[in-house]
UniProtKB/Swiss-Prot annotation:
Family indicated by similarity: Belongs to the SRY family.
Protein name (Swiss-Prot/TrEMBL): Sex-determining region Y protein
Job description of the protein: Transcriptional regulator that controls a genetic switch in male development. It is necessary and sufficient for initiating male sex determination by directing the development of supporting cell precursors (pre-Sertoli cells) as Sertoli rather than granulosa cells. Involved in different aspects of gene regulation including promoter activation or repression. Binds to the DNA consensus sequence 5'-[AT]AACAA[AT]-3'. SRY HMG box recognizes DNA by partial intercalation in the minor groove and promotes DNA bending. Also involved in pre-mRNA splicing.
Cross-referenced PROSITE patterns: HMG_BOX_2
One of the GO BP terms on file: male sex determination
InterPro entries, A to Z: HMG_box_dom (IPR009071), HMG_box_dom_sf (IPR036910), SRY (IPR017253), SRY-related_HMG-box_TF-like (IPR050140)
Keyword Cytoplasm annotated: yes
Subunit organization: Interacts with CALM, EP300, HDAC3, KPNB1, ZNF208 isoform KRAB-O, PARP1, SLC9A3R2 and WT1. The interaction with EP300 modulates its DNA-binding activity. The interaction with KPNB1 is sensitive to dissociation by Ran in the GTP-bound form. Interaction with PARP1 impaired its DNA-binding activity.
Compartment(s): Nucleus speckle; Cytoplasm; Nucleus
Residues covered by region (Disordered): 194-220
Gene name of the encoded protein: SRY
Any Pfam family the entry gives: HMG_box
Amino acid sequence: MFGVLNSDDHRAAIQHRNILAFGRTSSELWTSNPTSNYWCETRGNGRDSGQNRVRRPMNAFMVWSRDQRRKVALENPQMQNSEISKQLGYQWKMLTEAEKWPFFEEAQRLQAVHREKYPDYKYRPRRKALPQKSDKLLPAASSSLLCRQVLVDKSYPFTYRDSCSRATHSHMEDQLSSSQPVNIANSLLQQEHHYSSTSLRGSPETLATHLSADPPFYPK
């Protein structure tokens, strides 16, 4: 039992020693690299950490809004960052020149310190990424001449070009051609019925002639 306790105490002591060593190493790195210190102070993101990017010195508005932003965020925890920025910009415009002057002096002091600390610093604005053009899009000339085969009702193939007017016209012609014999038969029947009705309206002699011309009917 004592052997188990001694091993646990020994393991805990080793972990405590490693933690102390890591803290000592990190503190040495902090004091020996001023560039990384400035980067950590300005809260650089992970993308710029490999390049040790130096940020610009704060201007008068940034100096003033540093404390004001924290105050507004505490008073309005539900307000978004964009809304806070709009409100701070409006409040900054409402200040007089006398009220802004201390922040301009502080910004000038910070710029002087920045020049001494980074004499080779040059402002390099980030370029906005251009949207990539897709090669799948067809030019206007080729898209206007697009022609493809489409099946309507699985029995009327027609050609589609620029609009559906030709297809609709050809489809209507097919329907008219298919129904044309029925229409012709109906028209012939109407003509025969009209001729019979007009002939029966004539004289009694004509009616007798038509009746005698008909074959006799014998019921079965």
